[in-house]
Amino acid sequence: MNKKVVLSVLSTTLVASVAASAFAAPKDGIYIGGNIKKYYSTDVLFEMTPQAKATYASELNAMASDFNNVVFVDYKGKGASIEELFTKGSKVALGEPLKKEDFADLYKVVNKDGSSTATEDARAKVDPTPTGDLNVESVSANNLKEVVVTFDKAVDADTAGDKAYYTFTANKLAVDKVTVSGKTVVLTLAAKAENQASYELNVDGIKGLVKTTKEVKFFDNTTPTVAAVAAIGPKQVKVTFSEPLSAKPSFSVNNGAIAVVADNFVEGTKEVILTLGAQPTASTNTVTVEGGADYASYKVEKVTKDFTVVADTTPPTVSVKKASAKQVVLEFSEDVQNVQDKNVVFYHTTKGHEGYKGTILGVDGKEVTISFVNPLPEGQFKIFVDYVVDNGTQISDLWGNKLPEQVITGTFAADTTPPTVTKVEAKTNTEIHVTFSETVNGADNKANFTLKGVTGNVIPLTKAEVVDAAKNIYKVVTTEPLNGGSYYLTVKGIEDASKNKLVEYTATVAVADTVPPNVKDLDPATPGTDAQLISPTKVKIAFTEPMDKASIENKNNYMFNGFNLDSKVTLTATDSNTAVVVDFTNVVGFNGFKNGDAISVGRVLDTAGNPKTEMQTKVNLPNSVSAPLFDKAEVTGKNTVKLYFKELIINAKADDFAVDNGEGYKAVNSISNDVVENKSVITLTTGNDLPTTAAGVKVKTVGEVDAKNQYGVAVALTDVPADDKIGPNWLKAETVDTNNNGKIDQFKLTFSEALYVASVQDSDFRIEGYTIAGVETKGEVVTIKVTELDIDDSDATPTVAVIGSVEDLKRNASGPFEPQKAIDGVSAPDKEAPVVTGVEAGKTYNTAVTPDSADKDIKTVVLKKDGKELAGYALKTPISENGSYELVVTDNAGNTTTVKFKVDIPAEDKKAPEIKTVTDDKVAVADAPKWEAPKATATDDVDGDISDKIAVTYSSEDAGSKVTDLASAQTHLGTAGNTVKVTYNVTDKAGNPATAVSATFTAI
């Protein structure tokens, strides 16, 4: 069992135990038995010192071979050994009662600093093992579509009602529906069984029941009968049969006196509702049934049954039958109608709130299943039956008795147990089946699975898909067939319906070897298949898998340039029989390989005896010694790079290598050389930190290199890029107040690189003193939304903990992390009202106005005209209609500015003013020097008397005259017979010009 996985399971599972326990014992936490005998409470596990955590981890490692002696207890008092959690799955294991023998006699109670000052007697606090555990008394089948399972006592309705817990050996039959009543369970099959055939029924997963297998023989030699007939409405009659029918019978009411206008028969039903054309008036009536057939092809014998019609005046009732996080099953007291009418609405928690509105998934008899987008609150919850229109269609029984609007209560215990992998099995050399403990999401996404070989190489997958949803079985499919041997499948990113995230799980998968071996190309950069020249007289030929030693060392399986190998040539299997060294050293006259030399490899065998497919494979031989075969480089830690070679490397030293962290090459501090499958994995430790994205990280060899392969050839690397195999680092947490009201409503967590969104869940975080309402991930930032407190917490810097793991975009995981104090990112509460410009309180404007504000946190703007709100008004919108206005501007902090003003813009003036006519006149020559043109008068409908605005011009049509103004006009009139024309013009304020008026004056 993978210790790392176990430690992660323990850490993550305990998150569910934070809630206050309602039980006296056993206390929640981890009980380590064996020779250790220590009890770690949930609170202690979350707040231990680093030294105490290290001790805890070492103790778990010490118990890795005996996880039956490590017991986990949740806050509800449910518990199981870690071994049981892995082998049975958490849903089954935690459903079984704890027993005294699960615990040691006394445990030392561990404090946060790792010390122990008290003891805990968990064994004494467990109820004695109950007698009379649940048993299956009998299994029978009286027809070909139903199986009756009888228990020795009433069963747990939730687990007994799950069809996934009933399976038939060899999957010959499948259960479609389960009906639970006391200690009897009726299974309805998806397809009929064969008559007189026997099957094995497995019952496993029901609370209190050990897995039970019973033989059930299907033998149907009886005709179906009419079990009951009842009036369920004024025009509805229900006919119940003794078993499911495959074909519909005929029905007649009162010998045909009342027509049957419709029925709801479907194949496989036991109940048929007849809709009549008229309401029976007699107290006693008859239904005649004939024909139809059961699944053994026996017909219903003709029979006439009486039924009485008694008016029902009692309205139906409804209650909660079953509830999960986002789904509720309601059960009515009788058959009802109109449940799915658009006038019928269901809510939970708050009536009328769209976020709590339900969607009907289906109606089955008297039951309706409703789903919700937002989950139910834990504990007691409310379901509201509401009607959109009071006088609209309502739920009623078939007699028309209406169900009134009402509130139904129920109890929901939130699922806090993460799903587990219960089985991993290779079905073929391209398919691996994975079984989960419960219904999960994400198991059909191949990105949530990683398959590796024993050397750590990643095996490409083509897809992941469901095999059997009812049994939670999925499969992953490989791109190429797998060679025989062991592989490692890692599963992560999976969650159940309650958003509980699967702890990363790795399983060893054994695959039978049916794949033929082949020769491996050791130089993919050149055409053809190439060997490795390890010395002037030796070549290494590699294979795709471990080979039969005798086969690859047999000279008869090789030819050199078309001829049999010289008798002096030796063949030696190497690299765990995945390669062979062909040595020409002792061949007389051999001076080395030339261009074009090749060795042909025949049908050598792998360890399973599979021969190579091709009769001969030509392998090209280099004419110069090859550098040691290198595979890849990976950044695996803050200061570590791993180099993977395809062969054994010896004498490697730190000064053989340099690492570039993106800022230039630097020397390596130290190295380690691990050998896996006779191939070296060299770990380089650097002094400079490496980016978690591996961006710009490169490796090269420097100077005189001591690192060589077993044939004495030095390693040669030039600017080799390193892949990203390191998870993200958590940099900081910062408080946020989005509405600037002095209360924290978000925490912004920044990581060293962009995160894979699906890897981040609410349950990955804890914040001291705050309730998490949701998370959002964008790039490297995780925004945690929290419920605002009722106090001013703008200066708070609570402790933030990342208790789960998060992944980068390449699915590299990190976490949990050490808790951090949040950085104070919240300013003091905003108490300053918005500043409104463009209008002033109390002013009246005779032109259009445009209110505005430079504040950036405006939340609402309300404008009223003459007391009535103008919907949709926004700042910067001109106001040009006359009226009395009230403008209310509110910022995010709730500060408000109110401005009252008026707009009174005069009506547009389009009428020209009028000038009163001035009459022509005569002027005596003697009076000319003092003459002035008579005054004219002008009026305007808007501006009034505008006589003072009249403009006067002077002119003369006399020959040679130069009259332009009053003075020249006076001079001109000094001669008898001369004339002067005076013209009067005026324009009102709106720019409308009057019609000009003229008068002519003649000198006499």
UniProtKB/Swiss-Prot annotation:
Transmembrane segments: none annotated. InterPro entries: Cu-Rt/internalin_Ig-like (IPR014755), Ig-like_fold (IPR013783). Residues 1-24 form the signal peptide. Its main location: secreted. Keywords: Cell wall, S-layer, Secreted, Signal. GO terms for cellular component: extracellular region; S-layer. The keyword Methyltransferase does not apply. This is Outer cell wall protein. It is found in: Secreted, Cell wall, S-layer. The outer cell wall layer is composed of subunits of the outer cell wall protein. These proteins form a hexagonal array with a lattice constant of 14.5 nm in the outer cell wall layers. The keyword Signal applies. The outer wall protein binds to the middle cell wall protein. It comes from the Bacteria.
